[in-house]
Design a protein with these regions (language model features):
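Feature marking well-ordered beta-strand scaffolds used for ligand recognition
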Residues: 1-465
Length: 465
């Protein structure tokens, strides 16, 4: 492997164990790719689509990754005119059944950290856009749009589409504080229709005399502690597993798609999730073929915090193994281990690295196997996590009580200036920070990093089995 993939300047090295970097792509040099999706054409070509909602541009980045050693950047695909829709971003997307579905937001990303009521009258899109990839995967064809009904809000965040007629959304909804679960029928993609929804009882503002809320308010810690859907609402059969921030894990029954019902709940606060972290309960991932759900508490990017500024202890943000053989009694059975610190790493651990105090360290996004996406790895004995500053971590979960980390990759720090950052204007350290990961059916792993491009890796050594 060429040295260029280990370093981006003197003293700016990456760290790797049981993995090999096949390639790196900066795309067009404009950073901002966040959630990624793969699509495999009938001819066997692999395309990577990345939602971008920060840096210098919004929309979707498109690359061909058929040859993992030579990815080809195709284009930056703009969904809406940024001059007409200056606050509209595309933080998330899903691809299945030849359709690309994009989350539209006017309050996600850095904007969610500050109050935005003065922007509420600006033209925006908040919902989902639907495109066809079948005709030309390099030029998505617009089919339709569905609006969530809450202007200048987060709109839609991380969601699930596994093919078929239903899209499962984490979504804003009028009269509800925070995002709820909404189900949209796209049988006619030109005219999407909502067919069902579910919410935590405390979210229904109109159910309380005199209660009001502001959908444009900043996502301060007090809001993050509340029960609201981060997503995705992860569907397996007639059950849905929901990471619901302060409320923890919800298990829902959607045998009747028009009337989701709560089956079980497991709360993880106050023991887990730190005061300054992101989504208190972020992801709920059911492992293929097993009665197990992997649940995460989101950490946070250290660059949001001035060095030495955090004085109070931060509770553990971690990855948890939950047994759901009885959906009414989801049970915590094991904790994932702390990420291995490389021997030559310049900091003693990931909690204090480069921050001079304990930061809200923790995991972020997981690889999400879905049976409607046959081009993805579907293993139920492996978990892949982009762990913010701890990089990509791969776990062997064949024994759910004895979880083993088997590989990692921490990229070099990005070379972008603070002004070029995905999240510009924040005072903290700009370490390498992995955001999302996806694994294809050939075993190639793709990760993207904050203020950087994407890496394609493959397992080696003990991880290659």
């Amino acid at each position: 492997m060429a040295d260029m993939f280990y370093a981006k300047g003197p003293g700016n090295n990456g760290y790797i164990k049981n993995l090999e970097v096949c390639s790196f792509s900066e795309m067009d040099g404009n950073c901002g790719m966040f959630q990624m999706q793969l699509y495999k054409t009938a001819e066997g070509k692999y395309y990577l689509y990345g939602a971008c909602f920060g840096g210098t541009q919004f929309g979707v980045m498109i690359s061909e990754v058929t040859d993992p050693y030579n990815p080809r950047f195709v284009k930056h695909f703009q969904l809406v005119d940024p001059e007409e829709y200056p606050t509209t971003t595309t933080p998330k997307l899903q691809i299945a059944d030849d359709l690309m579905i994009c989350a539209m937001s006017a309050g996600s990303g850095p904007g969610a950290l500050v109050e935005q009521s003065e922007l509420q009258n600006m033209k925006c899109e908040v919902g989902i856009r639907i495109y066809s990839l079948k005709e030309d995967p390099e030029n998505p064809k617009f089919l339709g749009y569905w609006d969530c009904g809450v202007p200048h809000s987060i709109g839609v965040h991380r969601f699930m589409y596994n093919g078929g007629r239903y899209v499962h959304l984490s979504c804003e909804c009028r009269s509800f504080e925070g995002m709820i679960y909404r189900i949209v029928d796209i049988a006619d993609p030109a005219h999407p229709v909502e067919v069902g929804k579910w919410w935590s009882p405390e979210q229904y503002v109109d159910g309380y005399p005199g209660r009001t809320y502001d959908p444009h308010a900043a996502h301060v810690p007090a809001f993050m502690d509340k029960g609201w859907m981060h997503g995705p609402p992860f569907v397996r059969g007639d059950k849905v597993y929901c990471g619901y921030c302060g409320d923890g894990l919800y298990v829902l029954d959607i045998a009747d798609i028009t009337r989701p019902k709560c089956v079980g709940n497991l709360r993880l606060q106050p023991v887990f999730s730190s005061h300054l972290a992101g989504a208190r309960t972020h992801t709920a991932l059911p492992l293929p073929g097993r009665d197990l759900v992997v649940v995460t508490n989101e950490g946070e990017r250290f660059q949001f915090f001035p060095p030495g500024s955090i004085k109070e202890a931060q509770a553990l943000n971690n990855i948890h193994m939950i047994d759901v053989r009885d959906p009414a009694k989801p049970t915590l059975i094991a904790e994932f281990p702390y990420p291995e610190v490389p021997k030559d790493f310049p900091y003693p651990n990931f909690n204090v690295m480069n921050l001079e105090c304990q930061g809200p360290f923790g995991p972020h996004n997981l690889h999400e196997p879905m049976d409607g996406k046959p081009w993805l790895e579907q293993r139920g004995d492996r978990v892949y996590c982009c762990y913010f500053a701890a990089g990509l971590r791969i776990y062997d979960v064949s024994d759910p009580y004895y979880i083993k980390e088997i590989a990692y990759f921490i990229p070099p720090n990005p070379n972008k200036t603070p002004e070029e950052s995905f999240f510009p204007g924040f005072p903290g350290p700009r370490n390498a920070c992995t955001e999302d990961c996806i694994v294809d059916d050939r075993g190639y792993i793709i990760i993207d990093a904050l203020d950087d491009g994407f890496y394609i890796l493959k397992r080696t050594g003990d991880a290659d089995n």
